[in-house]
């Protein structure tokens, strides 16, 4: 049922005042009376918009430094009153019906994110009256409209103009859902913040008592896309994103052209983009089934692409390609003339490249923007009945942190190759082995239960493409528990090995490297990826 409700009286109280003056002016022009509080009321008055202070309406002043403003029966009775049922009692107590509530909440997340934020600062930014009004209006959505997002202001005015200054029940219900989502997210942020203080109980936000993991884990994501299916065709799926993601990512990327991204497209594109971010030089990463099958650097992205493709042209078919520089016309031409590709993602795409890619209508082209700093988000893995939550693996050793444990020191070229393939190995499914030489992958062995077999696969892949393993560096995402992996690497022609170290048999493994005249480098950091 349409069940329209006319808008005659509004209550406006916002912390984020984006667009509020224009919205209030539009409401006034449509005959709506406005109640408001504090800073919002002052702003509207300064703009010559007729407004009644809530304290004047209730006859009760704001008090306790603004802690108590709207918590009054004349406010909540006007919001919660059921039209046609509570009219008599509202009239008896001088309560005017409020038809639309426009509220957004104190900036708690922004406050606690600031350096030096104290518990007292956080507490004063916990909104009480705001969520109460939001929930009251959302509960009474049958009669009252609640607006918590500035991007809905134009929508409200447009519907009023086409619906005799009224809003439909469908619109009110939709806005009520957004309101409950808003307060749920807000309360979750507060719970997370306080939960990280256990067992210090807020006495000090520093030191050993602080935990980055709260007692309960509250996170909210917004649905960005319904999908045809999930990882497999019998699985239903949707894509959810954080409310305000800051980092350039597949979640924030703009799709320039192509079919809708599939579940697997998104997972693989994320893997490719996060890998290519590790490199400062022009780089290309080609991913298949969430594993890099070719990674290379070059003087430009065209050269990087040619070299990355050379590693494994077979696996590159139907893959995902990521760049850390603008996709130009020459590279777009090379890709479209050479191979079938599902997705290309880059920080930016030239107009000429867009025109070239347009000939491949199904090819998904994404532009993610530049990235600068890495975020401190969590990695979340669902298990049956629970969640595994950890820091994102953003660790990467520098040259100064490496420990050469072999008798032979690596040459400058070997050291450079070792650092390159170590970065790649971080993004290969465990057990991961990567061969590289001259800033390109020569062979990749991924996802084997045996580290030795991963090494063998890397060698087989290199041989299949006619690439020379002799003189390569080899990276292993975790330590070698036995010397057999080193013996196999030496037989293949590997001259330098980079690995975390830390095995009970490190001495045996190092001795094997020395026997073969290999250089061996310990990173002291493991990069398992499951």
Curated annotation (Swiss-Prot):
Gene Ontology biological process: 'de novo' IMP biosynthetic process
UniProt xrefs under InterPro entries: AICAR_Tfase_dup_dom_sf, Cytidine_deaminase-like, MGS-like_dom, MGS-like_dom_sf, PurH-like
Documented EC number(s): 2.1.2.3, 3.5.4.10
UniProt cross-references to CDD domains, sorted A to Z: IMPCH
Substrates-to-products reaction catalysed: (6R)-10-formyltetrahydrofolate + 5-amino-1-(5-phospho-beta-D-ribosyl)imidazole-4-carboxamide = 5-formamido-1-(5-phospho-D-ribosyl)imidazole-4-carboxamide + (6S)-5,6,7,8-tetrahydrofolate; IMP + H2O = 5-formamido-1-(5-phospho-D-ribosyl)imidazole-4-carboxamide
Domain MGS-like stretches: 1-148
Pathway participation: Purine metabolism; IMP biosynthesis via de novo pathway; 5-formamido-1-(5-phospho-D-ribosyl)imidazole-4-carboxamide from 5-amino-1-(5-phospho-D-ribosyl)imidazole-4-carboxamide (10-formyl THF route): step 1/1; Purine metabolism; IMP biosynthesis via de novo pathway; IMP from 5-formamido-1-(5-phospho-D-ribosyl)imidazole-4-carboxamide: step 1/1
Domain of life of the native organism: Bacteria
Keywords: Hydrolase, Multifunctional enzyme, Purine biosynthesis, Transferase
GO molecular function: IMP cyclohydrolase activity; phosphoribosylaminoimidazolecarboxamide formyltransferase activity
One family name in Pfam for this protein: AICARFT_IMPCHas
UniProt KW Cytoplasm keyword: no
GO terms for cellular component: cytosol
Family: Belongs to the PurH family.
Domain characteristics, as noted in the entry: The IMP cyclohydrolase activity resides in the N-terminal region.
Protein name: Bifunctional purine biosynthesis protein PurH
Protein's organism: Aliivibrio salmonicida (strain LFI1238) (Vibrio salmonicida (strain LFI1238))
Gene expressing this chain: purH
